[in-house]
Structure formats: C-alpha cells, structure tokens
Amino acid sequence: MELDLRRIKAERIAKGYTQDIVAEKMGWKSRGPYAKRENGVVPFGADELADFGNILGYSVNELGIFFTKNVPEKER
C-alpha cells in the first residue's frame, strides 16, 4: 500500500487550503516541512497524517482514502 501524494494535494486544494495554511495548522513555522511531505521528499509520519486528515475534516477511520495499492511511481 502506498500513500497517494496526488490525492493529498488534491484534497488540500479542494478544501481551499494553501501549503502555508496547512503548515501553520500543523504547528510548523513555515510551509517547508509540509511541502517536503506533500512532494514526497520526506515521508509523512503516522501522527502527521492523522493531523493532516483532521485539518481537512477527516476522521482517523477515513484516512484510507489517502492510500492506494496501484499508484504509478511517476504519479507519487
């Protein structure tokens, strides 16, 4: 199972949030740490993914939407 980073970005944009807004809500002083995760440079930690989901209004039980078994490498 792989984390679908395109879905993460799409859901953030659909909710009207910029990377700066999400980073601030996650307690980071700049968007850099969040941007690195969304772009796949640094992996999301489990707690970070739960926090991200919560920011967008998803419960822990709904986080499965951010995972898929068949995300091609070039689309991650």
Residue spans for each PLM region:
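Short alpha-helical elements of helix-turn-helix
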Residues: 5-6, 31, 46-49
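Short alpha-helical DNA-recognition segment
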Residues: 16-36
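Residues within the helices of the helix-turn-helix
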Residues: 9, 20, 50
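Residues in the helix-turn-helix
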Residues: 32-33, 43, 62
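Short, charged recognition helix plus adjacent turn
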Residues: 11, 36, 54, 61-76
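DNA major-groove recognition helix of helix-turn-helix
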Residues: 26, 37-38, 48, 56, ...
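A short, Lys/Arg-rich alpha-helix, primarily the initiator
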Residues: 1-14
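Short, basic-rich loop-to-helix N-cap that marks the start of a DNA-contacting helix
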Residues: 16, 41-54
